[in-house]
Amino acid sequence: MSDEGKKRSSRADSLEAEPPLPPPPPPPPPGESVLVPTSPRYRPPLPAPLERIVGSGEPPVELAPRRKGAGEPLPPLPPSLLPGDQEVTAAGDSCEGPRRLPEVKLPEAATGKGSPGEPEAGACREGERRGTGDQPETRSVCSSRSSSSGGGSDQRSGHQHQHHQPICKICFQGAEQGELLNPCRCDGSVRYTHQLCLLKWISERGSWTCELCCYRYHVTAIKMKQPCQWQSISITLVEKVQMIAVILGSLFLIASVTWLLWSAFSPYAVWQRKDILFQICYGMYGFMDLVCIGLIVHEGAAVYRVFKRWRAVNLHWDVLNYDKATDIEESSRGESSTSRTLWLPLSALRNRNLVHPTQLTSPRFQCGYVLLHLFNRMRAHEDVSEDNGSGEVVMRVTSV
């Protein structure tokens, strides 16, 4: 019984502690609709506002509290996002009209050194600080671009300078590979050459004249190389046969002439000179000696060219630069090896018996006249009266 009494007394105390219920709302006036209360809709809570990072000397800024219910209005927007004269509608279920949000005034420490009414100035200063912080990167990019553009211009100027630099006409290298010489009359891009390149070209070609301007190089032999430094040259099969023929002919000629002289003047060969068989041998040996002499003369030029090539390889040479005054003097004396031009009328080619190689008085131009004669024979099938107009033909003849 005591427990039941205690429960009843506690219930009575709780009923007394509860506030009284509010009175029902008065009925609406006639002619208006009755508002039926509805249960509030569920709205998720808003995320927590970001905390503003404040310096050590700045006071903390009061942040707006979180919204606790659907009937509570939204917190005001920061001044940087919403001007002071903009109106927004509170997101609630109270069906209220548009409401002007109160302006939040930030302290001077948060906005900078300006007045409280200048929040945008602080943002501008902050942007300026960010801009000044980004300046080194921009400057580095610009400097890298300028350096790259400067490097490109330097590279182009270097290519142009290298293009205008004199180069060797054999190896196409510049003066860094050696001293460049001007050994002949050639001009332009084929004017210069290296000493070693030209000597190697002369040794391979076997000629002391330029293949372009036909100028004979002025070279001086310094000394012969040591025997251990001698180099072999490349020769063809025909040149090998010519060399063997000249060597064998020379050996036979030396042996034959030596025996003939001993038989003719030695007192120990008196009986040989009186014998008829030895007299026949003398005639045969004399004929063979003449054949050997002709063979040596005929093939000696080729062997001499091979010897000159070998000598050019195994000698220390010094090529001299082209001297125009010396060239003019040689040309005036007729010692120049340049090509000559013959101007002949075109009607001379129509006459078959006008020019003949046997009528030449100077053997230096025989090659050119032979070419003219062959060209005349090739035109034999053409009609002579077909073209009676006057004209000229230019034939370039090189002295051999």
UniProtKB/Swiss-Prot annotation:
Q: Which SUPFAM superfamilies match?
A: Formin homology 2 domain (FH2 domain), RING/U-box
What EC identifiers does the entry list? 2.3.2.27
Where the record places motif YXXL motif is 369-372
Recorded hits in InterPro entries, A to Z, give:
MARCHF11_RING_CH-C4HC3, MARCHF4/9/11, Znf_RING-CH, Znf_RING/FYVE/PHD
List the biased-composition ranges (Pro residues): 19-31
Which amino acid positions bind Zn(2+) 2, per UniProt?
C184, C186, C210, C213
Chain intervals annotated as zinc finger (RING-CH-type): 160-220
Q: Where is the composition biased (Basic and acidic residues)?
A: 1-14, 96-106, 123-132
A GO cellular component annotated for this chain's UniProt record is:
cytoplasmic vesicle membrane
CDD domains cross-referenced by the UniProt entry = RING_CH-C4HC3_MARCH11 (cd16810)
Reactions catalysed, semicolon-separated, are: S-ubiquitinyl-[E2 ubiquitin-conjugating enzyme]-L-cysteine + [acceptor protein]-L-lysine = [E2 ubiquitin-conjugating enzyme]-L-cysteine + N(6)-ubiquitinyl-[acceptor protein]-L-lysine
- Print the keywords alphabetically: Cytoplasmic vesicle, Membrane, Metal-binding, Transferase, Transmembrane, Transmembrane helix, Ubl conjugation pathway, Zinc, Zinc-finger
Record's subcellular location: Cytoplasmic vesicle membrane
Q: Where is this motif: PDZ-binding?
A: 397-400
Membrane topology field? Multi-pass membrane protein
What does the UniProt function comment say about this protein?
E3 ubiquitin-protein ligase that mediates polyubiquitination of CD4. E3 ubiquitin ligases accept ubiquitin from an E2 ubiquitin-conjugating enzyme in the form of a thioester and then directly transfer the ubiquitin to targeted substrates. May play a role in ubuquitin-dependent protein sorting in developmenting spermatids.
Recorded domain comment: The RING-CH-type zinc finger domain is required for E3 ligase activity.
The name on file for this protein is: E3 ubiquitin-protein ligase MARCHF11
* Classification of source organism: Eukaryota, Metazoa, Chordata, Craniata, Vertebrata
Recorded name of the encoding gene: Marchf11
